[in-house]
Amino acid sequence: TEPNAGSDASKSQTEARLEGDHYVINGAKIFITNGPEAGVFVIFAMTDKSKGTKGLSAFIIESSFPGFSVGKVENKMGLHGVHTSEIVFTDMIVPKENLLGQEGKGFKICMQTLDVGRIGIAAQALGIAEGAMKEAVEYTKTRVQFGKPISKFQNTQFTFADMALRC
């Protein structure tokens, strides 16, 4: 994710230019899971902006590379055991052999990676929804209104039936 591109990989502003036996990369990525702790990253950068998505390339980088830095660490509402941060590349030197695949093939790699990630996020969301529904059902068994648990009211049962269909 980039500050001005969101999750639209085709709008990547990070640039990489080949200079002899290395690439020089400039740009930033945001919302990087374990950004302050990780030592190795796969990033995507434009090697030829004139080609649009066919100019996006993938690189394996290390936090020890000259020009790499960790930017702002996010103050999140949850998941405090996993830090999320910005990572910044200022004339970062990346060896030529750290190009992942071929120049211009990064968009395909990126899309394949995002597809797998999206499946995981969907599974996580479904698990959260199922857990929330379970908690709600238990609550309706103990919440008494008009002399009986609200789980006995037909409207509450219809609501849960609709929720179950959506999970």
Question: At which residue positions do the language-model features occur?
Answer:
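Beta-hairpin (beta-strand-turn-beta-strand) motif
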Residues: 1-3, 46
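Structural signature of FAD isoalloxazine-binding scaffolds in flavoprotein oxidoreductases
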Residues: 8-11, 62, 88, 94
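Short glycine/proline-enriched turns and hinge-like loops at secondary-structure junctions
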Residues: 8-10, 34-39, 52-55, 80-82, ...
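A short core secondary-structure module
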Residues: 22, 26-70
